[in-house]
Amino acid sequence: MSALRPLLLLLLHLCPGLGPGHGSEAKVVRSCAETRQVLGARGYSLNLIPPSLISGEHLQVCPQEYTCCSSETEQKLIRDAEVTFRGLVEDSGSFLIHTLAARHRKFNEFFREMLSISQHSLAQLFSHSYGRLYSQHAVIFNSLFSGLRDYYEKSGEGLDDTLADFWAQLLERAFPLLHPQYSFPPDFLLCLTRLTSTADGSLQPFGDSPRRLRLQISRALVAARALVQGLETGRNVVSEALKVPVLEGCRQALMRLIGCPLCRGVPSLMPCRGFCLNVAHGCLSSRGLEPEWGGYLDGLLLLAEKLQGPFSFELAAESIGVKISEGLMHLQENSVKVSAKVFQECGTPHPVQSRSRRAPAPREEASRSWRASAEEERPTTAAGTNLHRLVWELRERLSRVRGFWAGLPVTVCGDSRMAADLSQETAPCWTGVGRGRYMSPVVVGSLNEQLHNPELDTSSPDVPTRRRRLHLRAATARMKAAALGQDLDMHDADEDASGSGGGQQYADDWKAGAVPVVPPARPPRPPRPPRRDGLGVRGGSGSARYNQGRSRNLGSSVGLHTPLVLLLLPSALTLLVLR
């Protein structure tokens, strides 16, 4: 037995898996031929790689034992490891960026095109039905759609003012058509605008149409704008997170993971999977967006469902012409009552001379009536897209990326360059210091849990990551508020429209299942000057001048001209019965 002892010691010395320490590979693998072959294929100069192992006292990251790497080679391998890791992360996230960018583009194009379709349909139908009379006043309708686009595309402010200005301008154009026998100077029109802006809402020339239009269009625009902004924010945050520079601690851990086996002369020895997962979790802790990511996706889906349900953008775009027509019909049907109150408050204007009165429209034009065609199918854009299809696609795409950040370390370590395959989990692997089994526990989870990661220090504050998460939280909060009909960028988004009156929302404002909303009280809007082409605006004192000496004759004045008003209604009908 004693004679066999030297032979047993020699065999123990030569066995790679049973060596006395981590440096056993150096005693077995004396040649750097395999390392030279691998690095030569990568374009490394073979002059920098010794043919056999040398002392590793100069190494800064890898174990300072026998090595095939010079200092320069080690630094190049550190850079290569970083490039490999960043490439894997960016490639893994390219689908996510493409998904958010494509959804943003499709929804944005759809909403913009729906506004254009609504404007074109209204102009086409009104122009066909009323010809010259609509053309003369088309500017106020074009201004309305310009204001809606500005809200959606640009500042996100002034939606209330846009709608209120539209109804005020429409009244300034429509009211004189009811009374062509009078001349209406700017002071009278200023008084008219003030009267429709009073807090009590006593004069509602267009009935409840302004309020209903505002409720429908504002909630749809707020939701559409928040959804598109949310998709854009998500795309930008993800793109930034995937391109974050690798920190020094991560660079060194990556070098120990995939670079040091080359320096030890064992490039075929794959890193242990647990080792790779710890390095990946630690490096990606400054990129991951959990748990904000899940809430962000929920906000997108919630808002998308609202947009094809109670806050339907399609329905809102279609209803613009309908609500305007209903408002004009109300003004026509209640013209006597509205005129009496206006003349009582603002006085009776001067009559015009007979030769300058407007001639009535031809009887055949005045007798026209326009009826909305029944809705046959969901509106589509020129590309054949409708909102239902877009929402379905969004839901399907987001289901694929919900666990992206939590699963990114596993995805990275699934690459053959980063770790051993799962089928080789029981085989010896590279532990960071030598051949063996990786015994440290794999640390997953949040930033706080990564403080216990054995491979790199994650305790330093990460301001950029916190900022990105705050961006996601802000986008999520904006989308959830929009799903409730609130615009966080415009504090008065739920207030009632000017001159439209108050009260509960009507049952036909939304599709079935929508919850009625009681609008909060709104302070009176400051009066706006009339917006008539070519007319200046003087002070409000002119209204009082019209009141002086006229109120006592009001009854006879209104009574005298009422038959004339009724006779002239066919002329006004050509503008007022718009749809």
UniProtKB/Swiss-Prot annotation:
InterPro entries: Glypican, Glypican_CS
Pro residues composition bias: residue spans: 517-527
Gene Ontology CC entries for this record: endoplasmic reticulum; extracellular region; Golgi lumen; plasma membrane; side of membrane
UniProt feature, compositional bias: Basic and acidic residues: 361-379
Region of interest (Disordered), residue spans: 347-382, 483-552
Pfam families, per database record: Glypican (PF01153)
UniProtKB keywords: Cell membrane, Glycoprotein, GPI-anchor, Heparan sulfate, Lipoprotein, Membrane, Proteoglycan, Secreted, Signal
PROSITE patterns: GLYPICAN
Proregion residues excised on maturation: 557-579
Major subcellular site: membrane
Glycosylated residue positions: S55, S92, S155, S498, S500
Subunit comment: Interacts (via heparan sulfate) with PTN; this interaction promotes neurite outgrowth through binding of PTN with chondroitin sulfate of proteoglycans, thereby releasing PTPRS of chondroitin sulfate proteoglycans (CSPGs) and leading to binding with heparan sulfate of GPC2. Interacts (heparan sulfate chain) with MDK; this interaction is inhibited by heparin followed by chondroitin sulfate E; this interaction induces GPC2 clustering through heparan sulfate chain; this interaction induces neuronal cell adhesion and neurite outgrowth.
Function: Cell surface proteoglycan that bears heparan sulfate. May fulfill a function related to the motile behaviors of developing neurons.
Name this protein carries in UniProt: Glypican-2
Organism: Mus musculus
